Amino acid sequence: MCGATVDIAEPLVWRCPNALGDDGHHALELVQATAPLRPTDDDNPFLAFRRYLAWDSYAAALGLTDAAREAIVRDLDARVAAVAGTGFRITPFGRADALSDALGFTADGGVWVKDETHGVAGSHKARHLFTILLHLVSTEVAGRAPWASPEARPPLAIASCGNAALAASTLAAAVQWPIRVFVPPSTSASAAVLARLHELGAHVVECPRMSTDPPGDPCVHRFREAVTGGAVPFSVQGTENAWCLDGGRTIGWEMAGAPPDDADQGVGRLSFDRLFVQVGGGAFAACVAAGFRMAGATPRLHAVQTDSCAPLARAWERSFAVGGPTAAGRHWGECMWPWEPVGTSAADGILDDETYDWIPVLAAMAESHGAPVVAHEHHILDAAALLHRHTGIDASPTGTAGLAGLLTVRDQLASGERVAIVASGIRR
């Protein structure tokens, strides 16, 4: 891309400094060396993996002591638990024996499922947002925030009407930080989700398409206008706030560091042949892959979209005309643009018309010799039913779309392969 760098100690930098005006074709990435994962035995991933998180390095650069940084995590986690009913905890991950049998895998292979459905706000999304909140709060604690008091805080902003909005509003409520949530017209948004957003004190802004809007999601347009006006991008899109790519890696670290089922905790670790990860905006897949890569593991990554909206798969194919997936970022406009028209799917949480974090996802698939998978709707529906029937996990069709990708290409896999998926969000 443009080659700009940002020092880890620079406060409140969310985007590439060269992403000015309407030029959104920029993306920051976290630069960190591969290192053996040696988490502590704390059951909170933001404490267990704290020394690997970029926010911790940032807070240390501001002069906060190790004890102060740990205290910030514990305090915020307690506040989140008071609102959500749970704080951040390492989530279950293991072989789904009945599901593996149903899909014809041998005892040596099978499907391992990471269950995020009982996490904060019922999905993985809060993991991404928590490191943004940690960045904000540590900036305040260090006396580096440009606002003088909590009452003068700028509002948070997010464009979402689903799990990300719920996660963002939950974290905002925990610290009494004002938040604006940009949602599609009420006919397109879940009444239950909207009701919960209001309960959490969010300022919900409906965003019908305006005649002057360019292509793309009107909610994202209004969100960006709010950020231009001074709001903090409390977003799960790395192109809007790169700090969301920090906390999301904890999922990959938990999976990459998991011990074999027949070993004592801490003895060895599982190795996987493939990861199937559902993709909407792309940060989730980028983070899971980054977590594995930093741990020194590169199973084949398959980013899964539906045939109703598959801009990432299109970008993958287009990339081979401009030098391949790892060079595609220099040809943004030729590879990634809004998908039109966006169809319908039960997996409505991955119908983003753009895969905003497409560059790291393409690179991760290329590095691991993976490829995108476009799932048909019958596989989307089958996946949700299969997972619930064979594991009891009550995930939404969005949350089981990775399994739908596996179903789509099951006949191409050997029966002894080890496959990992993430049940990323609860059925509502």
What annotation goes with each model-predicted range?
Residues 1-81:
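N-terminal juxtadomain amphipathic helix
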Residues 57-145:
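Positively charged, low-complexity intrinsically disordered leader regions
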Residues 126-132, 158-175, 189-192, 245, ...:
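Short glycine/serine/threonine-rich phosphate/pyrophosphate-binding segments
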Residues 142-184, 268-284, 301, 419-423:
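A short, small-residue-rich loop immediately preceding and capping a beta-strand
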Residues 147-155, 165-224, 313-319:
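Active-site-proximal loop->helix
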Residues 209, 213-233, 238, 294-395:
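Active-site/ligand-binding loops adjacent to catalytic centers
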Residues 221-295, 381-387:
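Active-site/ligand-binding-proximal alpha/beta "capping" segment
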Residues 404-428:
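Catalytic phosphate/nucleotide-handling subdomain of diverse soluble enzymes
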